[in-house]
Amino acid sequence: DDQLVDALFTAAAVGGVIATRASISGAEGGCQAECGSASAMAAAAVCELAGAPAQAAVDAAAFALMASMGLVCDPVRGLVEVPCVYRNVSGVANALTAADLALSGIACPLDADDVIDAMKTVGDAMPASLRETGEGGCAACRVRIE
């Protein structure tokens, strides 16, 4: 139980840093801020569960954010269903892959704080149509299956 609690605290700490330095809101930073942040939090938690050093958890979080960089928030019909569900599934795979990289001893070449700051810069540069407005990206596609 203590190990799980520690992993949850690790995830919360990563999420707190991202929320402070950037955003965890799709309306502010696109899906990179939502799914990317969640993926980074999960990657760090997996490293904590594996008993890895703290730097591995930080590296895993940075790997996950780098892989999510630029992901837009474009909910079809304004509902958190399509493409959101699929992106969350991809976020799980991303988190596990990022954790595997860090757990195998691969160090992230970029500073995690810098990656978070880059995510904010990218989110700030996104047009409003790609930040949870339901106007651009997949939200602008025709719905084929009801």
Task: Place the predicted regions along the sequence by residue.
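Functionally critical mobile loop/hinge segments
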Residues: 39, 44-146
